[in-house]
Amino acid sequence: MKKVTIIDYGLSNLLSVQHAFAHFGAETLVTGKAEDVLAADALVLPGVGAFKDGMAGLEKLGLIELIRQKAAAGTPLLGICLGMQMLFDESEEFGLHKGLGLIPGRVVRIPSTDVQGRPQKVPHISWDPLNPAGGRTDFLSLIHISEP
């Protein structure tokens, strides 16, 4: 089984992410070291906090270009919460900030009403299904998926 490298840039609930992958039998490495990211079979970019701070953490560790290179080379990359947001071009959170640019688009605030004008809870916090775009399952194939 391939090793899942969980990127530690200072703003993540690393233990929960590591335990989730371990539950399915995946071997994991939690690291903020460039050499470990370079050698990774698959990457997870978790995160909790503000977009600007997350990008600053990656920059401080010298990981921004490395993550872009790994993604361009086809290394599976999963962003969780803030990590997913940082995959986009930019975010409007607390000003306009550049992201990793791996997904075209801008992260914007969730509207406080739905399309019918009904109030909706913000922030949206829940467990939602993971649906890979275009039916891709390359990242999910690294771990065993089972229904509860």
Predicted region positions:
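Divalent-cation-assisted or electrostatically stabilized phosphate/pyrophosphate-binding catalytic cores
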Residues: 17
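Short, Asp-centered acidic motifs that coordinate Mg2+ and/or phosphate
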Residues: 42
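Residue-level detector of conserved catalytic or cofactor/ligand-binding positions
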Residues: 140-148
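Extreme N-terminal starter segment of soluble prokaryotic enzymes
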Residues: 1-5
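Short acidic low-complexity segments
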Residues: 28-39
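Cysteine-nucleophile active-site neighborhood
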Residues: 49-126
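Generic structural signal for residues in well-ordered beta-strands
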Residues: 27-28, 107
